[in-house]
């Protein structure tokens, strides 16, 4: 057991002669012995002082302090002013703690390198003589919070978690958190005022779902006469919380909803208690009116994003939505479709509420569009109906084979002037066909213009005439109608992965990835063996749980550290034109912590594709002419394994050699000399050991 750190236990005392012995007994018998007990007698008029002196003479670890009556907050502050421990905990003098209370919290705060360890509690109702246990014996768990997610749990009523989190007792704090903080004097609900400041100062909080603290409900303590003071006690701490969080730039949606409920409760109880004519009641009524007005204003200011798809694309739709919600708030999604179940829409709306967002069900009958010719899917024509459904003057249309990696406020702030839309140039159209057109996968739509000009009908009319005469379905139609009438956006806002080689594009400063990554072509990242750049980005968003989306509190752009929070995987590249790769299965099986990327400019055989049964193998299939994929493979691989038989891709070997990256080969596979480290085939174990050494 660790005993190096001294832990201070602060006990404020006032007229608790009937309870004090049990409290102090529970502290001096703690299994963790390196404690100091600061007992502050706040002017007691009963025998509490004598009991304190008796215990201080019995246990040298007790520091006994007497002061004139100044209240609970002042007594706790006196304890803080006189503590010498590295950690501090508070125990109210009418309560008691479990024998392993200090030891358990201390072990966890050290194990998790946290700033605060929080336990739960059970209650003893003195009037009833009954214990109330909020946690079942088999429901123990530990959960880590940061200084934002902890606030989301202050409203968690299950297992009385919210009370456990907001109370001063039941926690072990790093003492340094109180260097500039003290309890507010003269305020009801002082625990809440202090803890929300302490949580903001912390970086990590570990919560233990275990009852370690016994909270006594004394006779008469439940009776409350509703007064102006109690109205302020309920609302003011919440008001301060919102102010603190707003100043830190944290999301406020959930906190504002709770604040609104507290105002309603205070006003209802105030009216029932005859306080309707008081200044406090009128003040709270005004706050409620302003809050309702603000809510209506925020509702009208949601940013409109339009998606169009059929239900067979549900995974892709969800991935696109997740990527948007990870970096944005206050979004009104319009899903234009013909076959999404209403239940799916309802369930998704429950998810989106947490992001101050919603999804609008925009159903179009398939007969309206299925008659049109398209080489992709008739759903590409669904964007025609934007003006019929969207109420906002500006809307962002997004294809669902893309992800968003940053906040979109700057894009929405684009001045469209009198243009019907803004879009990114289709650099593939320029390179392959000599056409100066825009790509229709990302469109910032001047919806006020579209409504005024009845663009839905115009698009349908042009499509009726031309849909079977053009080669790119809706994109050709849109470019015909808006020729020379569109505002050009930066390639960053529609980074088509197969077009980067044609665009003069550099990542903007502060971004690890393009703002919007568009996986155009048949090489979709969700398809097996479909090689493309930024494949891991799509899978990152796809794999995010909804509870994880809210963790990007400051709405930062996607960073490589998000995808690889510990470290990027050590990767070996094999670039081959043959499925005969020497000792490949032995290497893959022996080195499960190393990633193997097998790339081929030709279509790989079934034999080689079978290697994807191993979780540390990725196949890059048929990547001829995909220069950016080659560059990504070279950049993200630490070792080149020249272990394939047959034709060599000499430029890849040269790139690794010029970069000074290791190249390992077998003697029977080395046919092009670039300074490889070669092994005999029967020395595969030596190659394995070499790779282990390099990977460290």
UniProtKB/Swiss-Prot annotation:
Keywords: Glycosyltransferase, Manganese, Metal-binding, Nucleotide-binding, Transferase. GO terms for molecular function: glycosyltransferase activity; metal ion binding; nucleotide binding. This is Glycosyltransferase GlyA. UDP binds at residues 308-313, 399-400, 518-524. Involved in the polymorphic O-glycosylation of the serine-rich repeat protein PsrP. Catalyzes the fourth step in glycosylation of PsrP in this bacteria. Can transfer the sugar from UDP-galactose to the terminal sugar moiety of PsrP-GlcNAc-Glc-Gal or of PsrP-GlcNAc-Glc-Glc (using truncated substrates with the PsrP SSR1 domain). Has hydrolytic activity against UDP-galactose and to a lesser extent against UDP-glucose. In the N-terminal section; belongs to the glycosyltransferase 2 family. In the central section; belongs to the glycosyltransferase 8 family. CDD domains: Glyco_tranf_GTA_type, GT8_A4GalT_like. The keyword Nucleotide-binding applies. Encoded in RD10, a pathogenicity island with an atypical GC content that is associated with invasive pneumococcal disease. Pathogenicity islands account for greater than half the genomic diversity observed between isolates. The main function of this island seems to be correct synthesis and export of pneumococcal serine-rich repeat protein PsrP. Mn(2+) binds at residues 399, 401, 518. Residues 1-301 are annotated as: GT2 domain. GO terms for biological process: protein glycosylation. Residues 302-556 are annotated as: GT8 domain.
